[in-house]
Amino acid sequence: MRNLKNVLKKYPNVRLSIAHLGGFQVEDLYGLNAYFNFSAILPDYVNRFGIKRTNEILRLIGVDKLVFATDFPDSRCLKPKEIYDKYFEILNEMDFSLEEAENICRNNALKMIDKI
């Protein structure tokens, strides 16, 4: 993660999406000028930290920096519908507003690629 921080400091205008929320290096993510997708790892976060703490972690990273991604084909060999259903089941248990959910699932990605 240190290398990513150095790249972002050297090139502050680069648009970077960090996959899987950067793994479980949660503390290293706070304050980075990057986007974070939570493909595949969201259920793992919930299993490890629970819904409440996962929600807190996502909010500390910043709702405006979160991007939904499918990570298909998922290594868990689930069908796409099962993957999406699980993600949205988890997201529905969190306290995101409708606007925040729309940003995570669509608008943040559009902002991320806007200048490409």
Label each region the model flagged.
Residues 62-65, 79-116:
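Mid-to-C-terminal alpha-helical segments outside catalytic/metal-binding sites
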Residues 20, 36, 71, 101, ...:
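Divalent metal-coordination and catalytic microenvironments
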Residues 38-42, 75, 89, 97:
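Conserved short-loop catalytic and cofactor-binding motifs
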Residues 1-67:
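Catalytic pocket-lining loop regions of alpha/beta-barrel enzymes
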Residues 23-24, 73-76:
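Short glycine-enriched loops at secondary-structure junctions
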Residues 27-28, 47-48, 77-78, 112-114:
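Short, solvent-exposed polar/charged micro-motifs at secondary-structure junctions
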